[in-house]
UniProtKB/Swiss-Prot annotation:
EC numbers, comma separated: 7.6.2.-
Gene3D superfamilies assigned: P-loop containing nucleotide triphosphate hydrolases
Descriptive protein name: Lipoprotein-releasing system ATP-binding protein LolD
Topological relation to the membrane, as annotated: Peripheral membrane protein
Gene (name only): lolD
Function recorded in the entry: Part of the ABC transporter complex LolCDE involved in the translocation of mature outer membrane-directed lipoproteins, from the inner membrane to the periplasmic chaperone, LolA. Responsible for the formation of the LolA-lipoprotein complex in an ATP-dependent manner. Such a release is dependent of the sorting-signal (absence of an Asp at position 2 of the mature lipoprotein) and of LolA.
SMART domains per UniProt: AAA
Amino acid sequence: MNKILLQCDNLCKRYQEGSVQTDVLHNVSFSVGEGEMMAIVGSSGSGKSTLLHLLGGLDTPTSGDVIFNGQPMSKLSSAAKAELRNQKLGFIYQFHHLLPDFTALENVAMPLLIGKKKPAEINSRALEMLKAVGLDHRANHRPSELSGGERQRVAIARALVNNPRLVLADEPTGNLDARNADSIFQLLGELNRLQGTAFLVVTHDLQLAKRMSRQLEMRDGRLTAELSLMGAE
């Protein structure tokens, strides 16, 4: 079994507005191993996106903890969490969130700039990642000049440019047609094999989830089962 990279211990999340309490996550516990490809499957409103926000240190659980590489996130300062997100975690969303006035190369380079890497390293690494996703020939094109599938590939290159140990992906193919969605998941698998990056993908699509090595089901804020989707039609 691979070394545990990320572990959730009894995560709960409650929102309160006035006297109204809404429990979104209930005692969620699971782990992700080094280099693992894992999916969490659930319908809209099941708590998947809230869970990813907690895993990435973008929000704080009401109770429970997230442990990344043996270090509890509850003990990290805001600055330390930001550094963790920049250096060790990658994020992919349903919408690409590319900066419209920047080229593909400049968008991919942004995490390196934030991480204060050397200028020569920034350009070469960003171009290397664009080549890895098959878009080095589109390096100087802005998002408006790219197709939907190309924009999502640029977003994936940006997520991986700092060579993170884990990528958190929230419905990464939700805005794509079937052909482009298939292409994106093939790309994630290839990057996993080449770089050893672990991926945790949340999705409602069983056909896409079955591409991952392990699948968990989430309903109403609870992990209810480990699924067996290999060969599912």
